[in-house]
Amino acid sequence: MTTTVAVVGATGRMGQLISQIVEASTEFELVASLDSKDELSDMLGADIAVDVTLPAVSQGVVEYAVAHGMNVLVGTSGWTGERITELERRITGKLAVGVVIIPNFSVGSVLATSFAQMAARFYDSIEIVEAHGASKIDSPSGTAVRTAELMSQARGARGPVQAPHTDQRARGQQVASIPVHSLRMQGVVAKQDVVFGGNGEVLTISHDTLAPSAYEAGILLALRATRTARGVVVGLDRLIDLDGSRERAAQAAAGDAPSGPVDDGGPSGQAATVTSA
């Protein structure tokens, strides 16, 4: 049985891409394409709504869909922690609906953010540089904001990043104590560098989106999750098996033991680590 989809913001770059993916899929059917001239009521009757509008419009779209019992996939930037918390208060445990908020549909970008989250515990000097096309209105990007927030959470007892000279405008906008620098220019799809400075070293975790096709796998994954979502789910990382725990659980349930390392008669991993250059 196919799931019917209404795309709000269908004439934008992401709206067009999602519409194409839905139309090419056998799992989903595009039944409504809305732009700024259409009434939100035109989305009613679809199984799920996809919001890819503008930050100033997105909240109203989501509230309307939720009020009419529709699950929503949000691909619009600008959903701050406060706005998400308010949405959670409104619907969690009260309405049988789900809202899936995805700051970035790229699996590679999600992995880069996960790596940055791991590294944040080991460095006290951290900054983010993100770049998007000149037409992107909001800054910092939703991906940069989420990356900064996740790194701040991961730091735990290390506390906030103590970035120097943040009173100067050229030092970027602080998000969860981490300076974020935004570039908006022609020729760029999406790029983010998370830069860590340590004693005598610099670590850069970089992700560069070269074409919109990078979002396709994440969009399909998010659409599938939106069908059955309840409450508020934020981030593609919540939908993919980052640590392999779901795969291991599935193997255990099926009675399939995961294969262990092959003993080739050589030195153990510990010995090899000690003796290798």
From Swiss-Prot:
This is 4-hydroxy-tetrahydrodipicolinate reductase. The keyword Oxidoreductase applies. NADP(+) binds at residue 37. InterPro entries: DapB_C, DapB_N, DapB_N_CS, DHDPR_bac, NAD(P)-bd_dom_sf. Its EC number is 1.17.1.8. Residues 154-173, 247-277 are annotated as: Disordered. PANTHER family: 4-HYDROXY-TETRAHYDRODIPICOLINATE REDUCTASE 1, CHLOROPLASTIC-RELATED, DIHYDRODIPICOLINATE REDUCTASE. Pathway: Amino-acid biosynthesis; L-lysine biosynthesis via DAP pathway; (S)-tetrahydrodipicolinate from L-aspartate: step 4/4. CDD domains: DHDPR_N. The gene is dapB. Catalyzes the conversion of 4-hydroxy-tetrahydrodipicolinate (HTPA) to tetrahydrodipicolinate. One of its GO terms (biological process) is diaminopimelate biosynthetic process. It is found in: Cytoplasm. (S)-2,3,4,5-tetrahydrodipicolinate binds at residues 142-143. Pfam families: DapB_C, DapB_N. One of its GO terms (molecular function) is NAD binding. It catalyses: (S)-2,3,4,5-tetrahydrodipicolinate + NAD(+) + H2O = (2S,4S)-4-hydroxy-2,3,4,5-tetrahydrodipicolinate + NADH + H(+); (S)-2,3,4,5-tetrahydrodipicolinate + NADP(+) + H2O = (2S,4S)-4-hydroxy-2,3,4,5-tetrahydrodipicolinate + NADPH + H(+). The active site is at residues 132, 136. Keywords: Amino-acid biosynthesis, Cytoplasm, Diaminopimelate biosynthesis, Lysine biosynthesis, NAD, NADP, Oxidoreductase. NAD(+) binds at residues 9-14, 75-77. Its main location: cytoplasm.
